[in-house]
Amino acid sequence: MRRRLIALLVIASGLVVGGCAGSEDAPQPASAACPVSGPTCVRVGVGQPIYLGELLNLTTASGTDVQQSVRLAIDYLDGVFDGAPGQLLGHDVEVLSQEEECSAVGGRTGALRLIQEPSLVAVVGTTCSTAALGAADAVLSEANVLLVSPSNTAPSLTDPEQRRRTYFRIAPNDALQASAVADFAYVREGWRSAVTVHAAGDVYSEQLAGAFGESLTLLGGELLADLPVGGDAPTEEIARRIAALAPDVVLITAFSPECEQAALAIRSLAATRTLPIVVSEACQTAEFLRALGADARGVYASSPDFTYLEEDAFYRDGFLPAYRRQTGGDPIGVFHAHAFDGFALIADAIRRTAVVEPGGVLVIDRERLRRALLEVRGYQGLSGRLTCGSTGDCAEGARVAVYAAPEWPVARGAGAKPVFRSQKTLAQFSLGG
C-alpha cells in the first residue's frame, strides 16, 4: 500500500498546492539560487549526499523510537517501505547523529558538533526541551539551520518572546496537555487542590507543572505548592511537605529516577499513602512500574494519546508493519509519528525550494526552506493535521490521554485503555476555550 505524505504549502499567489513525495520529483531549474558565499546557501554536488542531522537523547527509549522513525522516513522517500533508503531529488540522505544528553550543555555541544558539517541543511531534534531552549536552538539559529523537534513540548520554546527563528516543533505545546490534565483532575475527579513536583532546573518539567497550576486555577482550583525534586531536595522531605499541605492530588512532572523516588516517598507515609498521584509522560516508564510494584496500582499517567494512530490505514497497514520489521517491536508512544512527519515536512520543503544549476549542482537555500515551513497549512500527517504558525508550533492541537497503572502503554502497548481522553486545539487554548 502506498500513500504519499504531502505538505500543503501556501505559495505567494495564496493558492494551496500539494507536491508529490516520490522519486520522480525534480528540482526547479536554477533561477534565484542563493549567493555562493551566502550564509544560507548549501550546494550539493552530483553524487554527493544531502546532509541532515539528528540531535536526540539516545539513552532513552523515546529517543531511539524517534531515531527508528527517521530511518523509516528515509526508507519512504521513494514512496514505499522496502527496507532500502530512498533518495531525495536524486541524492542520498546522510544523517549525522549527535547525543543531546537531555541537558542544555548536551544540546549546545551536540549542535556545535553538527554544524561542523558546513552543508548541514536541517536537524530533527531535540528529544528534551532543556536541550533545545537557549542551547541547541540558539546554536542552530545562528547557523541558519532548521531545528524541527518531534518531542519538545515546553511552552517557552514557541513563546514569541523567546522562540528562535529556525525552530519548529511537531509535538503539541504542553499548555494543551496541562489544560487537559487540569480538566481530568478538577472536572472528572473533583479534586480541588493540588501540589506539583518538578525536576529542579528542567525546562519541560518546570513549565508543565506551572501550566497545570495555571489551568487548575482558571477552573477554580488551587495550587498549594510547586516543589522541586533532585539535587538538594530529598524526596522524604518533599513527601512530608505534601502531607502537611494535604492536597487532593499530586502531579509529578519529574524524570526517572526522581519521579519514582518521589512517588515511593509519598506512598511510604500513612497520611499520603492513598493520595492520588498523576505523573507526566516523562515518568510513564517500565522502571516506574517495577520500582513501585503494588504501590503503582492506580497511579495515573498523562501523555499524548497515540491509540488513535491505528485508525489511520497508512499507519496501520504501512508504517506500523515496517516499524515492526525494522525494530522487532512496537513504538512506545506518539513521538515516532511526530518524527516521521517532521522529516517529511523537511523533505517536502527541500523539494519545493531547491534549484539545480547547469552541471547538476543542487542548491538549497536554508532561508527559503525556513519560509517554506512557515507556509505549511493543513498537512495531514501520521500525528494529525499540521499548520506551522509564526511561533513555530505546527501541531494544530493535542490529543491527551490519562491511564491508570498498571494499564500504561509501556506495559500494555496499543492495548492500554485510557480512563480519560481530551482533545484540545491551539486556537481554542489561545482564545481561552
Could you tell me what each predicted segment is?
Residues 1-2:
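N-terminal secretory signal peptides that target proteins for export/translocation
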